Structure formats: structure tokens, C-alpha cells
């Protein structure tokens, strides 16, 4: 399993997450009074991206553009053009810096910088070490490797001026409206590893639906997923689960006006006030202790995917019966056998092209699509919902 941290190489690359100490960024090749420009990139776990702008090493201190630092440290940014100042907002923290000034403020308290923020090619650069240490992150410097290690602490999601942070190691959930510091409002049950950001949707006045998802590990086969419903700063409900596999998480998130909360074995649909409108015990329905993805839902039926086998399932809400789709539609026997064999092999990386996909329902007739393995032709198959009884 690769390191979950990001690493910065001053000579070539900036690989990173977030962690800080008061170590000076000096080395034999860089004089302390020099200003050096270094093209860099960012690596998070097994993902690498090149930074558009070079980093600056000035008097042994590393400076990055405001947006890069705020992105790495999960901070919100407010720029005041009149005063040429930038304010960064994070969890229980406010940092203010001014272009060209060595005077900064952390939580309204005056602090003196080693190097001031500076303008380079229309971009404002600010000192990385100062900002990171202000939010209690510790950066370690390896002289021999010329690398800085910066582990990630928070994931962030924003929608309509509302920001949420999740502390990865504890699941603590924080909230801030507009240009404010983040304050704790509750917890999510899952502890995440490498997640950088997550989705936030404003579903009603003061009500937000949070959706979290991450893949990690050597092949990205370890997965965490979760959901939370927040109204007026209060967590109304939340759920999550962890699982392993090559296949994507195909769970839907909303059905009409309701949102989904699931742990992979139970599913419930809530309205905007957190009232449960429907609840299903998926493992009881199927009489199998597996993880199930909810791919479609209405008052008549539900489409599930058994994650380990990738078999598609139709559940008739009225008759309270469930069937495997491949057993009911008119697939050639050879194709059924292929699906059955693939479903039995827990280590098989099933070809995503060759699984059954729900298409639509018209007048009670459901249609599905499947690409045959024998000729790679996509065919359409039908199933009458009344047969699921």
C-alpha cells in the first residue's frame, strides 16, 4: 500500500498532503538569501498532477500561490482588492496576510513573517510553512531527499457559500457559512483515509445533503462511502460503509424529493426534514449477507446490484419479492453461464462492459441492456414487473 501522504521535492516535484514544523527550508544548493523558482507537481496517494505555477523558494522559505495553499490545506479564501489582503478560513482558524507585509494575523493576533506575501505574474504567493503551522500541521524536511512530507487532515465540500469539513481520522464534521471559521456540528461514522473533497447539495432552505466517497490502497480497491443530511447546523441522519473491490460504487443518492442513507445492507429514504419515508433491510430481502448498491428506486420497485457478484436485482415493492435479472430475462444460456461464473469468482475483475444495465420501465415493462461476450453486440431484454412475485 503506497504512502497516504504527499511529498514535496524542492528540486523537482511538490508531492503533498499536509503536516508542519518550524524547520527552515534551506539546503546546500539554495543560498538562504536567494529566490529560486521550481516547477512542481502534486501527488495525493496514487494520484499525481502538475502544478500550473512554479513554487518560489525565498530566503529558504517555500511560497505557493494562494489557491494552491488553500487547496492543499482545505481552506476557504477571501481576497480584499482594496487592502491587498487575503484571509484564509479553516476549522477553528482564521489567517490574514497582506501583500508585501511581514505582519500577519492568526485568530486576530499579530504575527511577524520571515518573508512577506508577494506578487509573481499576477499571482499572489504566500509562505507555505507559516500557513500550515498556523493550522497546526507539521511539515518535515528531509535534506538528503530534498522532500517535504505533508499528510492530509481534512476533506472539504462547498455549496452555495456553505462549507463542510470532515476530519479524516475521527469523522468530526465542521460547518461554516460564507467567510467564517469552521465549527463542529457533529460526526460521521466512517473514518476516511485519503479523501480530499466531497459533494454537498443544497436540497432545501438550510438543508444540505453530503455524499462522501474514496478509493485507496495499491489498486484502489479499498473503498469508503457515506452520506449525511444536515439541517440548520444539525446532523439529522448519516450512514456509511466500507468495502473492497474493483467495481465502482453505483449507488444512487436521490429519488424524487428523498435522499438515500445506506450502509450497504440497509437502505432508507428521507425527506428534507429527515423523516424516513421508506426503509429496506436489503440482506433480509435477499437472504444473503452481501453489500448491495441501490441503483434505482420508486414506490413500485427497486433496482439493486449485488456488489460482489455484480448481479442485477429487481425488487417488487408491492409483492415484497426480489429476483436476479439474469435468471428472468431471455439471455442465451452461454451468457447466463458466463455471468454466473464471473459472479462466483470473488477475485475476478469483471469486465464492466458485460454486466446487465437497467434502462427504463414503461407500462410495467422493464427494459435492460446487456453486451454479449460472444459478439460484443448490445441487446435489449424485457421483464414484466408483474412476474416479480
Located regions from the model:
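Primary recognition of N-terminal secretory signal peptides and signal-anchoring hydrophobic helices
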Residues: 2-15, 20-199, 226-230, 251, ...
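Short, conserved, GDST-rich strand-edge loop motifs in beta-rich repeat architectures
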Residues: 155-160, 212-221
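N-terminal secretory targeting and juxtamembrane "stalk" segments of secreted and cell-surface proteins
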Residues: 195-203, 214-216, 241, 353-354
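Blade-loop segments of beta-propeller domains
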Residues: 233-250
